[in-house]
Amino acid sequence: MRFDIITLFPEFFASPLSSGLMAKALARGIAEVVLTNPRHFSTDKHQRVDDEPYGGGVGMVMKPEPLFAAVESLPALPRREVIYVTPQGQPLTQQHLWHWSRERDQLVILCGHYEGVDERVVEHLVTQEISIGDFVLTCGEIPALVILNGVLRLLPGTVGKAASLHQDSFEDGLLDYPHYTRPAEFRGWTVPPVLLSGHHGEIAAWRRAQQIERTRQRRPDLYARWLARTQGQAKTH
């Protein structure tokens, strides 16, 4: 799979791409990451990529010409998505990550800066707007890295035990269950006895109950959706 990151700061990605599972995945040829700086496509002698907004207002807006030129300079694979990371986008979910990992050959991720990009970029170049939360960051590189990491770990061969991917939080609409390891007792705090019992059925039931209760307490929005879906499935049987 190919990832194209359109960024004013390619150096931002140096450390993440050279460490951990992402570095191993790239070394194995599971994916390719190409960083493209839109400044290189500016026709301004000072390589400016931003200008003042029409209608007035604070801040600067990224110009359309360098962004269009940067994206159009890339090879276009048959199943390509052009993503703009912005607080105005759809909230990123695990379902987005799975969809891209299975249904796309190329992700082009546009990192915004300043007050954002010229709306013509969004209307005529971008195919999907994505937000990682209801907050504002200084740059689009951080959410771009979130998407890159989230999709990359789902590609076959990146994670050693592929089965573990389906036990993560959000895979079935619930949060993950608690995890414990040795020692069985630490500073007087003990591991739940059921996990030491060796009864796989009881362990599975305990973990499921923990998932449901944890989701109900911490993410009532997720719990409500899970409950509605579960009840709907029960009515169809």
UniProtKB/Swiss-Prot annotation:
HAMAP family, per the entry: TrmD (MF_00605)
Function description: Specifically methylates guanosine-37 in various tRNAs.
A molecular function GO annotation: tRNA (guanine(37)-N1)-methyltransferase activity
Organism from which the protein derives: Thermosynechococcus vestitus (strain NIES-2133 / IAM M-273 / BP-1)
Protein name (record): tRNA (guanine-N(1)-)-methyltransferase
Protein family according to the UniProt entry: Belongs to the RNA methyltransferase TrmD family.
GO biological process: tRNA N1-guanine methylation
Compartment(s): Cytoplasm
Residues making up the signal peptide according to the UniProt record: none
Residues that coordinate or bind S-adenosyl-L-methionine: G112, I132, G133, D134, F135, V136, L137
UniProt cross-references to InterPro entries, sorted A to Z: Alpha/beta_knot_MTases (IPR029028), tRNA_m1G_MeTrfase_C_sf (IPR023148), tRNA_m1G_MeTrfase_TrmD (IPR002649), tRNA_m1G_MTases_N (IPR029026), tRNA_MeTrfase_TRMD/TRM10 (IPR016009)
An annotated GO cellular component: cytosol
Keywords from the UniProt entry: Cytoplasm, Methyltransferase, S-adenosyl-L-methionine, Transferase, tRNA processing
Record flagged with keyword Nucleotide-binding: no
Known EC number: 2.1.1.228
